[in-house]
Amino acid sequence: MDSLSAYPPQSTFQQLQNDEELARRLQDEWNSSSPSSAPSSSSSQNQVELDEQFARSLQNSQSSSYSLPPFDHPPSKNPTSSSLSTRKRWRQKRLWSFKNFPFRPPTRLTSTPSNSSSLPSIPSSSSTPSISSIPHTTSSVSNDIPSVLGSSDHPIDLDNPEHLTPPSSFITAKQLSRLPTPLPPPSSSSLPTGTISTNSFCPYERKVQPEHVTKELHQLLQHNTPSPFDTIDLQLKNEQVQSAGLLVSLLPHQVEGHAWMESMEQSSKCGGVMADDMGLGKTIQTIALLLTQKSQDPLRKTNLIVVSVALLHQWAEELSTKVHPSKKLSVYIHHGSTKKNLDSYELSQYDVVLTTYSMLAYEMKQNDAFNNNNPATATPPPACSLLETSWYRIVLDEAHTIRNRDTLAAKCCVKLDAKYRWCLSGTPIQNHIDEFYSLLKFLRIKPYCVWSLFAKDISRPLKSYRADIVEAALKRLRILLASTVFRRTKETRVNNLPIVNLPPKTIRTVSVNLLPEERALYNEQMSSAQSLVDNYFNNDHDLSRYGFLLVSLLRLRQFCCHPWLVKSSSLDNSFRIRDSENVRNACKSLDPLTIERIATLQDFNCSVCLDPCLAPVFIIPCGHFTCQECMSMLVGQKYGSSSTSTIIAKCPMCRGNIVQDSLVDATILQAIHGPLNSLKQLELDMNQSFSEQESIKLRWENRIDQMFTKKFGKRASEWKSSSKLNQARQTILDIIGSKRNEKILVYSQFSQYLCLVSHMLKLENIRHVRYDGTMSANQRQKSLHSFNNDKDVLVMLVSLKAGSVGLNLTIANHVILQEPFYNPSIEDQAIDRVHRLGQQKPVTVYRFITKDTIEERIVSVQRKKRQLVKEALDSNENNPLSRLDKEELLYLFGLNS
């Protein structure tokens, strides 16, 4: 068979002659096979419906990315006997065209070239297909059209609505369930050794068939409840677990959780979401599962546990100290300096492999980069042992890390091969319901591991304005959660008794009033921010302005902590990119190879700070880019303030000169050269929660900590406190003054502010340590050791992002939250570092909220998000809440009450 690419083109005249000859043959064959030329009333009605369908197909095909051969306009739709034969003739010609020129939808995925035999065959010009090979005017669809669902060269990603079959292929939605399955991916033998196919075909990404969906829904609803608590023999279960090698006894609620995990692995789901509240023992329940449910297959025996970097050694210690030496598990840490570049066979010799999300993302990026290059090059394939290994069980700790399904880590987790899959997260839903889909996709929970079904049944209906649609979607969501998620909170009671006895937790909200001079400056900042918001919404949501809007939010929040945090970063000095004729001409002069390199980028990572960019700035003509903050540092002045076009600066990558008119942003680049792969990330940034977007901005703050502290040390004589810093000082002194030797955690999102708190503590002769993202793993470990073992160290200053997960800090019983965070789950996780199993003292939490500022509005946003999680996981109310939208954004800036 010849492939489509080998099919010889014909002249227009020859093509028309063949069409006419084929039409005459089809007409004769059609007439000879018809018992009567007069159509019945029912067939006439079907005829009209089909005619309308084809007319719509013709209309839609004009905008298709793959245009069909030109045809004259169809005859009249009036199904009379005089015009019927002409109409049939035109339709048969049309069907033959679809047969010989199949529609191939575009794809954003890069597939490995396959053999020509995998493509549908094209008949030669001399052969005339029989009437049986042409789709008739019935509701059925021929199995000879495999291309409408894509091929190995053009796979369709079912998670991307853009890749679904468009109407120009004339296949209707009702017929979609009867289409043939996609062609299989190319065999691994056709790939270079050591590579992973990037084909989007996966077992869970298949065409949706109603009968399969019904069957899968029935399977989903089976085994959806754990065994009743009072029917479990706790003593017998504990004996079984301890005989398997566990050194500690499980608490009653942990025995129940372990039993549920065992039952889920025995069901068709092969895993689930263990969503116990922070501090209830998800780790020990998982270790018990590893011991009691070991693999019997020596070729697939290894468990992969994916954690954050901060938890690597904690998991290793738990696996070492909680398991009897005679049953000890062999553990290998696949990360950093301990990584030995083992291949998949060597990894499969261990019982447990510990790795990190960043390591998975790195392997995914390396593999994609290799597959996107020419396979004929001599570049050796990268080592992707995690992707190549067949795992027995995969456990994602803090699984909400992959809640964004478009990140490299999430994509890599989905591609991993395993028999059983588990998600451990106390907050499986944080900002919106769509985050839960990423966990379902990893778990391959059918049928909702396909985005089109999840969106149709749950995601989109929850955003409806009709109460009945919302109620139905909420019921479906709760059934789905009940079938896949097992969750207990610290307030859960069994037989009218709490499942765990913890000391009481008291949360105190402390209102902070700005000083008069601070209030005047804050009002100035708010006015500038409001003008930016007005410009943003009045300019059709210009992406180039969106980054400035986020920065303005950041500055307002920083000001509430201390004016010095924004003293050198006023909104008026924001770095701006101008759209001018010179800029566009510079874009047009880009080298084609440079354009191709930019277009294939998967992520916008700044070449200076290596952080993801909200609005990257490209340098012409080299095509390298940085984030706006780094470019502002490079040029050393506010953009556009210079009277000359020359800026004395060098590209950080190639050391070429940077000229003012040679700086462009991604939106201008796209307007001239078309869509970029990486612009998908910019669109994603628009839909992400504010917490995720601002965390990118905050990473830059960590990089200037040392410079800020050095500068601050020289200005010690100019030291000036703030209203919030005064409140923190008074609260800490009151706790220490009680002389109970109680320790304190001080959380803040801003590392610069922690520098100010540190200086204040030094002035008060209070010993303290720090724990933030700027410190190495060894430095963090030293801080933890000092805080836990040195009685004189009473305070630990903790970055909210770095210290909100994985730590056990029950040595402290006071928590001070210096400012509110958009995502309340992050705050809850930070508090649970203290209020968890092992805590012996009452816990007090102080939440500082600056009065009549943006912080009060953030608290209001927090309430909505808490309500969302409550409705999804606990409540029976029917009022879902969506993600932050335009109205909430206006509300944050005080432009909407």
Swiss-Prot record:
Q: Which domain of life is it from?
A: Eukaryota
Q: Where is the Helicase ATP-binding domain?
A: 263-446
Provide the protein's localization.
Cytoplasm; Nucleus
Q: Could you say which EC number(s) this protein's record lists?
A: 3.6.4.-
What is the name of this protein?
A: Uncharacterized ATP-dependent helicase C17A2.12
The Low complexity compositionally biased stretches are: 32-44, 57-68, 106-142
**Alphabetized UniProt keyword annotations:** ATP-binding, Cytoplasm, Helicase, Hydrolase, Metal-binding, Nucleotide-binding, Nucleus, Zinc, Zinc-finger
What span is annotated as the signal peptide, if there is one? none
SMART domains to which the protein is assigned, alphabetical:
DEXDc, HELICc, RING
Domain Helicase C-terminal intervals: 727-890
Question: Which terms does the record give in the GO molecular function aspect?
Answer: ATP binding; ATP hydrolysis activity; ATP-dependent activity, acting on DNA; helicase activity; zinc ion binding
Region annotation Disordered: where it falls in the sequence: 25-89, 106-168
**Residues bound to ATP:** D276, D277, M278, G279, L280, G281, K282, T283
Q: Where are the transmembrane segments?
A: none
Name which cysteines form disulfide bonds.
Answer: none
Q: Name one GO biological process term.
A: double-strand break repair via homologous recombination
ZnF RING-type residues are: 606-655
Main location per the UniProt record: cytoplasm
Source organism: Schizosaccharomyces pombe (strain 972 / ATCC 24843)
Which cellular component appears as one GO term in the record?
A: cytoplasm
Pinpoint motif DEAH box by residue range: 397-400
Q: Which family does it belong to?
A: Belongs to the SNF2/RAD54 helicase family.
Q: Does the keyword DNA repair apply?
A: no
